Amino acid sequence: MSKSHPRWRLAKKILTWLFFIAVIVLLVVYAKKVDWEEAWKVIRDYNRVALLSAVGLVVVSYLIYGCYDLLARFYCGHKLAKRQVMLVSFICYAFNLTLSTWVGGIGMRYRLYSRLGLPGSTITRIFSLSITTNWLGYILLAGTIFTAGVVELPDHWYVDQTTLRILGIGLLMIIAVYLWFCAFAKHRHMTIKGQKLVLPSWKFALAQMLISSVNWMVMGAIIWLLLGQSVNYFFVLGVLLVSSIAGVIVHIPAGIGVLEAVFIALLAGEHTSKGSIIAALLAYRVLYYFIPLLLALICYLLLESQAKKLRAKNEAAM
């Protein structure tokens, strides 16, 4: 069926509206799970220096995440303006954190990049490279921290210290294998479900790891600041890495409950009080999830309203 066929246009409109409705429903469901009064009270009463420092790091983290899509721009060779790429990346990341990868990482990217004139094959490569970049940094940091034994696990937890070290070594081996293939593989092209992917150079792979690792470290620094710097920074970072993989396994939007459960299990008592942890993580959610999501929603609506004009401008420039 031709894309100009009336049935195709109708189907596209229906799918678009279904997507909008799904996003709205997810936002409403998520909003009902949040104690907004408590969230506002925590932010209002927080130490101003720690809060402003954390806000600055949130901005830095979102800018770094935007570099994932800028790397993908270089990798794919598309010509969208860098500011458009950064804006799409910001919107997608905010929705991804709160409403899951399917909505933010995939759905939003396909919606916005296609509206700006990119073909589906290019968008698939952008998403693939972005998610690879994110997890390469995670794997490198988690491998290093788990192997070094920075995270002290409580007795009778789900895994013991030895298992965590073995996991860390395994993660570092994944990094080594990826770098080896990027540096020495002769067959550098692969096709997955009709999409052609090209293995990047080893220098590009190092850039992926560096940018993503810095982003994960900034995220850890935000929580560390909000905890009042009362716990070793690398311990806090390690706990964040453990909670992140737990959130992926449980697959709850925004990891509601998972983040708190892991932090309380690994930090409460000897290191800091349970109340301090809950307050810090609630402030973290407000600064890193809620406020960016509200801004992303506004940016999304503005981008949708300007999409046709921007697409025409992009197609004229290509």
Predicted regions and their residues:
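Internal, well-ordered alpha-helical segments in soluble enzyme and binding-protein domains
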Residues: 109, 119, 128-135, 139, ...
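Membrane-embedded alpha-helical segments of transport systems
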Residues: 91, 95-99, 122-143, 246, ...
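Interfacial segments of multi-pass membrane proteins
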Residues: 112-122, 239, 243, 261-276
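Transmembrane alpha-helix interface/packing and boundary motifs in multi-pass membrane proteins
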Residues: 92-100, 241-260
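Re-entrant/interfacial helical elements at transmembrane boundaries that shape
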Residues: 103-115, 144, 253-268, 282
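Predominantly cytoplasmic-facing regulatory/coupling regions of multi-pass membrane proteins
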Residues: 1-90, 147-248, 274, 279-281, ...
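Membrane-interface alpha-helices at helix entry/exit sites of multi-pass transporters
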Residues: 83-87, 101, 106, 116-132, ...
